[in-house]
């Protein structure tokens, strides 16, 4: 279980980091262009101001004709740490509960407590329900499931042969009706 959880978490961190282009460091220390432009330190000099592509290649921010350095984003960092903490905590809880149940099953400890053993007798409940269901089903078949108009024929086929097999319309047997060996 741990063997599958750690690579999954690593893959998540790797994918998150590759979105920013900063790698995993971008997950733990995210940078942002948010905030006031005028409080920031300029980036790339005059050439970056004149060429926005150069500014972005230097991994700086460009807004309103100003190229400036990014700042660490503390709110995003807190969100990332919160998500990482809950993911690791949930994974740890899942692994420990699986191990606990596995251990308890091996020790044959997964039984109902003594105070619940006598109170939950399902066999009696099921038998009572099945008796009630029998009378209910009899009522349903007599009322709803049998068609109201059945074709009545004078001679009913008692031998068990299907229609056209061994009998004629009048109920007489044909030559192929019985096998005589």
From Swiss-Prot:
Q: Which InterPro entries does the record associate with it?
A: P_trefoil_dom_sf, TMEM190
Q: Which Pfam families match?
A: TMEM190
Q: Where is the composition biased (Polar residues)?
A: 142-152
Question: Origin, by domain of life?
Answer: Eukaryota
Biased-composition ranges, Acidic residues, are 170-181
Q: Which residues lie on this side of the membrane: Extracellular?
A: 22-81
Topology of the protein relative to the lipid bilayer: Single-pass type I membrane protein
User: What residue intervals traverse the membrane?
Assistant: 82-102
Per the UniProt topology annotation, the Cytoplasmic ranges are: 103-181
Q: Which GO terms describe its molecular function?
A: identical protein binding
Stretch list, region Disordered: 135-181
Could you say which residues form the signal peptide? 1-21
Task: Please cite one Gene Ontology biological process associated with this protein.
Answer: hematopoietic progenitor cell differentiation
List locations, semicolon-separated.
Answer: Membrane
PANTHER family attached to this UniProt entry: TRANSMEMBRANE PROTEIN 190
Under what name is this protein listed? Transmembrane protein 190
Organism in which the protein naturally occurs: Canis lupus familiaris (Dog)
């Amino acid at each position: 279980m741990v063997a599958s959880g750690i690579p999954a978490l690593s893959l998540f961190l790797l994918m998150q980091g590759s979105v920013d282009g900063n790698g995993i460091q971008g997950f733990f220390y995210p940078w942002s262009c948010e905030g006031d432009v005028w409080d920031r330190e300029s980036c790339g000099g005059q050439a970056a101001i004149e060429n926005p592509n150069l500014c972005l290649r230097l991994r700086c921010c460009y807004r309103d004709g100003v190229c400036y350095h990014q700042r660490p984003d503390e709110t995003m960092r807190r969100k990332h740490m919160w998500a990482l903490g809950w993911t690791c905590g949930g994974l740890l809880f899942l692994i420990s509960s699986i191990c606990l149940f596995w251990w308890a099953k091996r020790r044959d400890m997964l039984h109902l407590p003594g105070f619940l053993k006598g109170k939950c007798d399902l066999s009696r409940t099921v038998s009572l329900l099945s008796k009630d269901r029998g009378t209910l089903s009899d009522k349903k078949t007599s009322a709803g499931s049998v068609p109201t108009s059945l074709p009545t024929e004078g001679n009913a086929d008692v031998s068990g042969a299907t229609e056209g097999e061994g009998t004629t319309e009048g109920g007489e047997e044909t030559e192929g009706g019985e096998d005589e060996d």
